[in-house]
Amino acid sequence: MWFLTTLLLWVPVDGQVDTTKAVITLQPPWVSVFQEETVTLHCEVLHLPGSSSTQWFLNGTATQTSTPSYRITSASVNDSGEYRCQRGLSGRSDPIQLEIHRGWLLLQVSSRVFMEGEPLALRCHAWKDKLVYNVLYYRNGKAFKFFHWNSNLTILKTNISHNGTYHCSGMGKHRYTSAGISQYTVKGLQLPTPVWFHVLFYLAVGIMFLVNTVLWVTIRKELKRKKKWNLEISLDSGHEKKVISSLQEDRHLEEELKCQEQKEEQLQEGVHRKEPQGAT
């Protein structure tokens, strides 16, 4: 029973956040920014185990920054890349791909991959926050939203149909189109594996372990019993041989005694025959 209890304690509950894994958040919350802009990455852990020292990685290489916040001032193209972080004994975070752009207009988003049902916020951002009007948002080359004055666009609940390539355009002194074209992916919901499945799985493993143990013990006892039985047969066989040998010896002695008695009788008869002759 203790074995099954231990197995049940190992059962993971799907749908819960891994509280020991670091998570990167951005301020402002966009993964694409213009050159010379400032962006700060924060390394956060819900339940931080052990030491709170922080390590940052850019394109797989450890950086010299050891604080929970990684601040980039006056961003340049060299700051583009894949960022990860780790705090103390936490697991390393999922990567954040930061892009630094040049141009007059930029379509910004907080992530490039979303789970179905999550909100998607888009921002058509002008260089140095210049005023832009008659803003159009495009998906897969087709305009789908118009704002007379620049405004952020929020899709409250994303679904698979929102997958595609996005960009924006707007008017300033001239007609501008966003620098770079961003591909955004909406992943379908993955149904969590029910807890009962894990319980049944570990229960089956426990039963298999128990059955194997019982079989092993049974086979071991059977082997010991057979070994003892063979030994007893061997001993009995040896005893029978000794008894037979003893009987054979007794028979041989009896035969010798009979022969001896017969010889004595013959001698006595010979003596009796000689006595009458002497008397005559």
UniProtKB/Swiss-Prot annotation:
Listed transmembrane segments: 199-219
Q: What induces it?
A: Up-regulated by IFNG/IFN-gamma.
Signal peptide location: 1-15
Q: Which residues lie on this side of the membrane: Extracellular?
A: 16-198
Q: How does it sit in the membrane?
A: Single-pass type I membrane protein
Q: Which UniProt keywords apply?
A: Adaptive immunity, Cell membrane, Disulfide bond, Glycoprotein, IgG-binding protein, Immunity, Immunoglobulin domain, Membrane, Receptor, Repeat, Signal, Transmembrane, Transmembrane helix
Question: Which sites does the entry annotate for glycosylation?
Answer: N59, N152, N163
UniProt domain Ig-like C2-type: residue ranges: 22-101, 95-184
Alphabetized GO MF terms = IgG binding; IgG receptor activity; immunoglobulin receptor activity
Topological domains on the Cytoplasmic side lie at 220-280
Q: Name one GO cellular component term.
A: clathrin-coated endocytic vesicle membrane
Q: Does the keyword Aminoacyl-tRNA synthetase apply?
A: no
Kindly report the protein's main subcellular placement as a broad class: membrane
Which cysteines in this chain are paired by disulphide bridges?
C43-C85, C124-C168
Question: What Pfam families does UniProt report for this protein, alphabetically?
Answer: Ig_2, Ig_3
What task does this protein carry out? May bind to the Fc region of immunoglobulins gamma with a low affinity compared to FCGR1A. May function in the humoral immune response.
Q: What is this protein called?
A: Putative high affinity immunoglobulin gamma Fc receptor IB
Organism name: Homo sapiens (Human)
